[in-house]
Amino acid sequence: VLGGDECDINEHPFLAFLYSHGYFCGLTLINQEWVVTAAHCDSTNFQMQLGVHSKKVLNEDEQTRNPKEKFICPNKNMSEVLDKDIMLIKLDKPISNSKHIAPLSLPSNPPSVGSVCRIMGWGSITIPNETYPDVPYCANINLVDYEVCQGAYNGLPAKTTLCAGVLEGGKDTCVGDSGGPLICNGQFQGIVSYGAHSCGQGPKPGIYTNVFDYTDWIQRNIAGNTDATCPP
């Protein structure tokens, strides 16, 4: 996260850390057995750590999990990495809530333009050279009007995405923050998907998967209906 500060150790009990060979992502715990991240964070072999703050100084209640099942939208266009950029993961065993671990529920309402949204992650805090912090960084940005975003990206973002940033630039998610949450007015509204080639370019806000549009798909999969499709 660019332009932020170290997150408070107690403000992100739902934020988890996904790591594989040579890369990592954020993810969000939504209940005792399920987490949500970006589809582009998938790999054949990854582990997830919950209850993490510092990567060097471990919390006593940290828990590590492997994916038991992974779900991406069956109607996702596989040739487009960023189409329907959401993945639902069932953990290999349930998590118990603890001091640094607690889920964030799915949103009950869609987000509104202008909302103040919190971003967080262990991604780079500098550009163009990347610097990865030991603890997650947090910043507040704003939800931007969809049309503004389409203009900035030549019509690229799909309707099931949100745009958020600050127009003067300098505050943004960055490399390594993918898959983490966008929390607007206390609700889990977005998943970090992509952004301008260089993070923090004001006129090009970050692009986030719109969680509200996928709540039905998520709930159906959790209930065992794995044939559920996502919105177009």
UniProtKB/Swiss-Prot annotation:
PTM text: N-glycosylated. Contains sialic acid residues. Deglycosylation reduces in 50% the formation of fibrin clot.
Secreted is among the record's keywords: yes
Keywords attached to this entry: Blood coagulation cascade activating toxin, Disulfide bond, Fibrinolytic toxin, Glycoprotein, Hemostasis impairing toxin, Hydrolase, Protease, Secreted, Serine protease, Sialic acid, Toxin
EC id: 3.4.21.-
Tissue distribution: Expressed by the venom gland.
Disulfide bonds: C7-C138, C25-C41, C73-C230, C117-C184, C149-C163, C174-C199
Gene3D superfamilies named among the record's database cross-references: Trypsin-like serine proteases (2.40.10.10)
Residues annotated as the enzyme's active site: H40, D85, S178
CDD domains registered for this protein in UniProt: Tryp_SPc
Domain of life per record: Eukaryota
Cell location: Secreted
Residues bearing carbohydrate: N77, N129
Coiled coil: none
Record's keyword annotation contains Magnesium: no
One annotated GO biological process: proteolysis
Activity regulation annotation text: Inhibited by leupeptin, heparin, and 1.10-phenantroline.
Family label: Belongs to the peptidase S1 family. Snake venom subfamily.
Role according to the record: Thrombin-like enzyme that shows clotting activity upon human plasma. Shows specific fibrinogenolytic activity for Aalpha chain (FGA). Subcutaneous injection into mice induces a mild edema. Intravenous and intramuscular injection reduce plasma fibrinogen concentration and increase the levels of fibrin(ogen) degradation products.
Assembly and binders: Monomer.
Listed name of the protein: Thrombin-like enzyme BjussuSP-1
Source species of the chain: Bothrops jararacussu (Jararacussu)
Phylogenetic classification of the source organism: Eukaryota, Metazoa, Chordata, Craniata, Vertebrata
